[in-house]
């Protein structure tokens, strides 16, 4: 796997890491490499992981009272079609092994996650799909803040089932 700690995606700066977590070449990998590996190991559809500290999703991850099984109650079809449920992982210090442990438990059934007070993590079957999923998550988080306390028409169970079929 290749991973980038931060900054631009310069191919010369990517870290190459073995499936067991051994650093093979390139820049020193991110301290969060363990949770990337946990997602790859526990979700065969996960071929790419994108983790950001984007404004809207990170702001959402800081709110109290979120449903930890699904932070985003479906109100647009694209959340359902691209991501499904978005579980919340409790706050741990960045790089803490418990992030990887919690994501490993959630990985098989999910492809998008919020790390409490930290930010979003998404998977995809390609880097492009993971980036698209991240964009959808970020824009949906933005909509949540734009809508604020206004009444939202959430999708019904029937509408959600139709989108998943």
Predicted regions and their residues:
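Glycine-rich flexible loops
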Residues: 4-165
């Amino acid at each position: 796997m290749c991973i980038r700690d931060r900054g631009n995606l310069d191919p010369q700066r990517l870290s190459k890491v073995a499936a067991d977590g051994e650093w093979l070449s390139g820049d020193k990998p991110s301290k969060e490499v363990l949770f990337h590996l946990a997602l790859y190991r526990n979700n065969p559809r996960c071929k790419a992981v994108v983790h950001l500290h984007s404004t809207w999703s990170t702001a959402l991850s800081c709110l109290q009272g979120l449903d930890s099984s699904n932070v985003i109650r479906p109100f647009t079809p694209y959340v359902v079609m691209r991501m499904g449920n978005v579980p919340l992982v409790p706050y741990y210090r960045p790089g803490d092994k418990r992030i990887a442990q919690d994501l490993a438990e959630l990985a098989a059934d999910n492809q998008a996650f919020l790390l409490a007070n930290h930010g979003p993590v998404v998977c995809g079957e390609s880097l492009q799909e993971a980036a698209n999923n991240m964009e959808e998550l970020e824009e949906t988080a933005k909509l949540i803040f734009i809508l604020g306390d206004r009444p939202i028409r959430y999708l019904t169970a029937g509408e959600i089932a139709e989108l998943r079929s």
